[in-house]
Design a protein with these regions (language model features):
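Sec-dependent N-terminal signal peptides
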Residues: 4-13
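N-terminal, motif-rich segments that launch catalysis or mediate targeting to/interaction with membranes
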Residues: 15-132, 136, 152-235, 241-245, ...
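Catalytic Zn2+-binding segment of zinc metalloproteases
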Residues: 141-156
Length: 322
């Protein structure tokens, strides 16, 4: 398992990751069909705030860490890992063993497990369980969109680029979020085979790795070591972090790569929620006890979402001060 991930969760770095998860979870609500979207909007504060719960669990649950990634290039999967890893979990266990899969990552299993529980909760009108599993599912699906969740070189530690993980998924979004276009014009799509689709997402993420590592090398070379890094005192230790100048330059070097992946992630989260609702028979109980005022507020906020003004109007919950 990844001890680094536990360090990030317990320390200062994870708070930046929280921003991205909360933002993506909120954005996933707006494109949903009106009835389902209204249900999630009525419970928006919970959905957004609990989007980070799987990361928080890492502190106390030793089984949690491996649920957030799949190191596709691990030796156990062989050179043809892009095509050879079975999507069916039982077949994967038979081929590699459960211990090997747990070591290299279980995010496909966790997505499918939580998805099935969400479908069950929708079918049986288990309101609280729907919200619980929807929040968790959104987190795991979003994590699968992060390239560094698909490789043994998950923090650049194998290529002398340590710190890449938090740089890509946290520091750049935190620095540049206000410049992002948060509206995505596509409606949620029904996912007929979630088990296969999550592997498609992971392969997309994995294909982004070369560009990321190359960009880090080029920006560091252009700025020089002194402008690329700073020494910071954290928890009684002096540690090296990327400078603000480097973070901006790296984000600029990648162009729309990070914001596009973030918005694509929110669309896929929305699609997983929608598909679970459809697989449960599109239950109508989701519209129970929702006021006319809440419906009007949802429609008004969707207008702000479409005009990319959630930040300027103060509606993006992840930016609210506690």
């Amino acid at each position: 398992m990844r001890k680094l991930s536990l360090v990030l969760v317990c320390g200062f770095l994870v708070s930046w990751g929280f921003l991205a998860h909360k933002t993506l979870q909120q954005l996933a609500i707006y494109p949903l069909p009106s009835d389902l979207g209204l249900f999630f909007y009525a419970n928006q504060d919970y959905i957004v705030e609990q989007s980070i719960r799987p990361d928080v669990r890492r502190k106390d649950d030793k089984t949690e860490d491996s649920k957030h990634y799949l190191d596709m290039d691990a030796a156990v999967f062989g050179p043809n890992y892009r095509t050879d890893i079975p999507h069916d979990f039982k077949q994967a266990v038979a081929k590699y063993s459960f211990d090997s899969l747990r070591k290299e990552g279980l995010v496909p299993l966790e997505v499918n497990r939580v998805y099935a529980r969400l479908v069950h909760a929708f079918k049986n009108e288990m309101r609280d369980s729907v919200l619980f599993y929807a929040a968790d599912l959104g987190h795991y699906v979003a994590d699968a969109h992060v390239p560094l969740h698909t490789t043994k070189n998950h923090d650049g530690q194998l290529t002398n680029q340590k710190g890449m993980h938090v740089l890509w998924e946290s520091l750049v979004p935190e620095a540049q979020l206000k410049n992002y276009t948060l509206f995505y014009p596509k409606v949620p799509e029904y996912i007929a085979k979630p088990q296969d689709f999550i592997f498609q997402i992971l392969l997309e993420s994995h294909a982004m790795l070369p560009e990321m590592f190359k960009a880090e090398t080029e920006v560091r070379k252009a700025l020089g070591e002194e402008k690329s890094f700073k020494m910071v005192e954290r928890y009684g230790k002096t540690q090296r972090y990327y400078t603000d100048e480097f973070i901006q330059a790296f984000g600029d070097k990648l162009g729309t790569s990070i914001p596009n992946r973030m918005i694509q992630s929110s669309h896929r989260v929305s699609s997983f929620w929608y598909s679970a609702w459809k697989d449960a028979g599109s239950p109508t109980w989701v519209t129970k006890d929702i006021s006319l005022e809440k419906k009007a507020a949802f429609e008004a906020e969707k207008v702000q979402w479409r005009s990319n003004s959630l930040i300027s109007t103060g509606k993006l919950i992840s930016l609210h001060k506690k």
